């Protein structure tokens, strides 16, 4: 049937057939162990009593992509990718509110599956992810917030995990890059920046903020 829809459909069907299900099966087993087997009336015995995984998308604690929450940040090196929120909007010039960005991103991410039909890749099967929660930002002090974010990112990077930061306003780009750079021993760090503006001012309204991160 997929032949009549063209090569993209053919690729999607064939790629999906080759996907491993190891992580999916491990998540089911973990859910049954930690969340108790489902009630006797539940016919699908893969469903636990307490939600302990990706499903259902409308339930559970809000982490990015329903990844496991890791309270002990010293253990983040056990994962390929570590998510950390940076709820800070003290670097905005005009419109506040992005401090609630990490909450919003986590909430909406629960509605999305991990499989890309275009790429033939299942994120949950390809890498291991965890969510470390949020960096303790300082609303009244942008420089102290930068220090906090840089330390958090540096810790994750040094552990061997890849840090993904959920902001937060644009000023946090500086703190994020600085956190990675601390581990490069003078090596080069590339930046791919998508924005309407280049954000390379020295200062804005006499401060380092959302229009200045790449100057510094």
Segments predicted by a language model, with ranges:
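Conserved alpha-helical scaffold segments that buttress catalytic/binding sites
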Residues: 2-216
């Amino acid at each position: 049937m997929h032949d009549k829809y063209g090569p993209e459909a053919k690729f999607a069907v064939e790629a999906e057939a080759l996907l491993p299900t190891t992580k999916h099966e491990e998540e089911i087993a973990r859910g049954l162990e930690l969340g108790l087997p489902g009630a006797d009336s539940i016919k699908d015995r893969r469903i636990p009593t307490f939600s302990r995984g990706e499903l259902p998308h409308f339930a559970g604690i809000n982490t990015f992509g329903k990844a496991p929450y890791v309270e002990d940040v010293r253990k983040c090196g056990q994962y390929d990718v570590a998510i950390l929120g940076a709820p800070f909007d003290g670097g905005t010039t005009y419109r506040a509110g992005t401090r609630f960005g990490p909450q919003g991103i986590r909430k909406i991410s629960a509605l999305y599956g991990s499989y890309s039909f275009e790429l033939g890749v299942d994120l949950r099967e390809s890498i291991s992810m965890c969510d470390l929660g949020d960096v303790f930002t300082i609303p009244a002090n942008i420089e102290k917030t930068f220090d906090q974010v840089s330390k958090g990112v540096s810790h994750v990077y040094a552990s061997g995990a890849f840090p993904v930061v959920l902001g937060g306003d644009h000023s946090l780009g500086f703190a994020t890059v600085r956190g990675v750079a601390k581990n490069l021993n003078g090596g080069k760090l590339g930046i791919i920046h998508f924005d309407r503006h280049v954000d390379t001012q020295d200062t804005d309204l006499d401060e380092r903020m959302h229009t200045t991160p790449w100057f510094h």
